[in-house]
Structures are given as C-alpha cells and as structure tokens.
Amino acid sequence: MRLLLIFTVIFVFYLAILKRDVNAQQQGIDSEEGDAETFFNRTYSAHQSDLEKRIFRGYDIKKRPVKNASVPTVVDVHWHVIHVSINQKEQTMTLHGHIYMRWYDEYLVWDPKDFAGIHYARVKKWQVWQPKIRVSNSASGLASAFDFSTSAHVIIQMVEKDRAKVEMYPTFSIKVGCMFDFGDFPYDQNKCSVNLFATDTMAEVQLQNLYNIPPTLSFGWEEQKMKRIISDFKILNVSASQFYYGSGNVSKTAPVTGFELGNTWSMLAVNVDFVRHSPYFWSTIVAPTLVCTMFIQVSFFAPTVSLAFVINLMAIYLEFMFLQDITIKIPLYLSKRPSSITLFHILLISNIVSAVFHGVLCALCSTKVPVPLPIRKIYAVKDYVPASWKEEGMVVDYACDTNWTEWTRTARPLAGLAMFVYFVIMFILYLVVRI
C-alpha cells in the first residue's frame, strides 16, 4: 500500500513537469497563448526593416552600382505593350504598357542567413540607382519626364555573394511623332517606332533587349488577348531592335574600343507595323461608285435625250455626296493620289462629260441646225446592223439625213458602248495594278 502511494505521487508530479516542458517548447508561432500569424508577420516586418537599414546605410543613388568604374552597367529591357493608339491627322502614335528593366547592383548585398533567410526585398523606385532613359522621338520633347511613371516598385534579389539582381517594372505612356504615308489608301501600310536611349554613354550604361525576346502584346483579356484591330488600323507586328548612336551616325554594329564606348549611346526601338482596317470600304465607297457607273451607262440607252440628261444630273449629285464621305475618311498626308480616289475622279469626270454630251444633244435636237457632214459618217455603222433589227422606214441614204434626232439615235448607243469598255478597263487596272 505504501509502495502504491509512492508511485501515485511520482506519476502526478511527472505529468505536471512534462506539461510545463511542452508549453515551453510551444512558445512562438505554435504557442496556444499567441496569434501565430501576428507573430510571423511582426518578425518578417522586423527583419525587412533591419534589412533595408543595412543595405541602404551609406548607399548613394547617384553612383553607379559597380565597384569597378571601368565596368559598364548592363540593363536588360523588355516591353509589355497593352495598347496602341494611332492618330493619322496628328501623325502620332501613343504606346501604353509596362517596361521591365533588370540590372545587377554590387552595393545592395546582404547575407540571407543574418535576416531569417530573406532573399528578396521590395523597395521604392527612388531608393535605388536606376538608369536615366529617354525617348528620342517623344512628342513631348527629348527631356520629357512624363513618358514613364515616377512611382514603381523595385524587387531586389540576392542571387550571388557579391551582387544583387534589381528588377523594375514601371508603366509608360509614350507619344511619338511618325512619318505616315497614306498614298495607298485604303490599302496603306505604315511603320512607327519608339526609340529609347540611356543618357549615359556605353562606357557607363548599356541597354540591350532581354534575351532578344520580342515585345509582349496584351491588347485584351481572355478571348480578346489576341486582339489586333484598333480603331481604323490592324496591328501586323510589334518587334524590338537595337542600334547605336555615335558621332552623329546611327549604326547596328556595336562599338569595341574604349574610345568608341565613351562616344556612343545604346538605343532600343519598338517597331509597330500596321495596315489600315477598312471593312466597309467596298460597301460605302466602291458599291456607290458602281451604282453611279450604272447610271452613266443607262443614260446612253434612255428613250429620250432629255431623260438621259436628267439621269446624268442625278448621278453627279450622288457622286458629290459620296465625294464628301471620301474626303472625311481620307487622311490629309499623301505622297501621291490614292488609286481609289483616282478611279472616283475618273468616274466623276466621265459623268460630267456624259451630262454635257446629252445636254448639247438635247439643245441641238430642238433646233433646225443640220448635222455636219463629217459626223454623218457614223451612219455607216447601220450597214452592219442585221435587217431584223432595223426599224420600218429607216432612212437608206444616211448622207442626206441631217436630222439630229436620227443622229443621236445612232450615236448614243455607240458612245455608251465605248464608255462601257473604258469603265471595264479602268476597274481592271484598279483591281490588278491599282493605278
């Protein structure tokens, strides 16, 4: 009985001691008395604060992040374009998106073991050294400070013992002047570029395209991510290129010697190729033109000359209405007259000539002026007309017929046939050769 009492006392005291040891081990993140999330965040925040104090102690944002001044800082650049806006009247293009820049900093280094294994630090853009970049063809001017956002987060990653990788991803909205040529309207195809350069020479800063990857395009979300049609234009391709400016010349060959590096600037370009997207051109311009052409043709086969003259006037009125629509749509800058406008002008002039022709005939038919002998030779055509087509009482001696009414009855169908052949040739040239 005494032995059982001793074992009971020992067992009770042992459980109390064991529970105390377990509670002592669970203090911290797994403690039942504290909030694990709050404890973890407070610790991470504290480590981040200590890390920023450490890496920015004595850091100079105006000094290039290399310990050897003779070594240039290489900045990798990648473009992410989310929208393109083209203004054909102002001859400008506006590019919106994000620009990714990456370089290595030899001063923003730390040992992750001293800061709870932290390998990343997120800081403000103004806290670190960054390359000074400008857009050479910016519509706001060469020294514009509004092309790139002034606020952007920077990620610092400790990748090596003696240097850290710095990544910056600011947004941009760049408006540049372009040289558009719409001489092939509505089949015109143009190209415009955004030229980026660093204000420091290549002896200090060198820009280059990240792994030669072309710009990323995201003009929409989900189903619209492959969208390429914006307003009146279709984006054909967006590419990136690199070239060098030095001694007043532009070259694609990189400099080699130290003297050349000290007098050359690296430049990057985003090239946007686009073509006009005009799906309604045929229905709004070509189709009405064909209708006017039919009016011209019908006028030559109208029963009376006066009716033909009225048809011509109506066609001229319609063409002037369509001409106003074309004038509104066509761009202002043209190196040559577009083939579509040339064709429309030909049809308009042909209609005016047809109206004058029928107007003169209408006036002559109401007079007793005889038909001049030279143009009476047109009656010879009737000799080739089948007998079944000839009307009763048709004059046999055409040389003696001086009646303008009879002459117009023969001349108008011939003129209409000649006009038809002329129109067919013009349309074929427009479709095949595009005058």
Curated annotation (Swiss-Prot):
GO BP, sorted A to Z: chemical synaptic transmission; determination of adult lifespan; endocytosis; monoatomic ion transmembrane transport; positive regulation of egg-laying behavior; regulation of endocytosis; regulation of membrane potential; response to caloric restriction
General function of this protein: Thought to regulate endocytosis in coelomocytes through modulation of phospholipase C activity. Possible acetylcholine receptor.
The protein's name in its UniProt record: Acetylcholine receptor-like protein cup-4
Keywords: Cytoplasmic vesicle, Endocytosis, Glycoprotein, Ion channel, Ion transport, Ligand-gated ion channel, Membrane, Receptor, Signal, Transmembrane, Transmembrane helix, Transport
Assigned GO CC terms: cytoplasmic vesicle membrane; neuron projection; plasma membrane; postsynapse; synapse; transmembrane transporter complex
Highest taxon, organism lineage: Eukaryota
Signal sequence extent: 1-24
Native species: Caenorhabditis briggsae
Protein family according to the UniProt entry: Belongs to the ligand-gated ion channel (TC 1.A.9) family. Acetylcholine receptor (TC 1.A.9.1) subfamily.
Keyword match Glycoprotein: yes
